[in-house]
Amino acid sequence: MNRHDNFDFTLVCTVKFYRGKRSLPPDLSNGKYCPHFMIKTDTRYLGICFIEGQRADLETLVKSLVVPLYEEVDYSGLVCGTEFYIMEGQNKVGEGIIDEII
C-alpha cells in the first residue's frame, strides 16, 4: 500500500518547471516524484506525489495527476483555481494551478 492510498481525492493540475532550477524535468508518471506544493498566498509546504502526467519539458505547461501524502497535513487550501509553487527544499522549481479535483 502506498502512503497516498489513504486519501479519497486526486488533483488534476497544469504545471510547468522552470529552466535554470532543474537540469532535467522530472518524471511525472512513475509515482516517485514527491516534492511539495506551496500555495502562492501561503508559506506552508504541502507534501504531494505526482502519479501520472505528460512528459514534462522545462517551461512547458503539462497536465498531471497529483495526490496528497500526509494524513496530518491540512490540504483544504488546495481547491480548483489554486495557484502554487512546486518546491524542492527551499527552491521554487516550478508552478501550477489546480484544474479539477476528482
Identify the role of each PLM range.
Residues 1-102:
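C-terminal effector/interaction modules appended to NTPase cores
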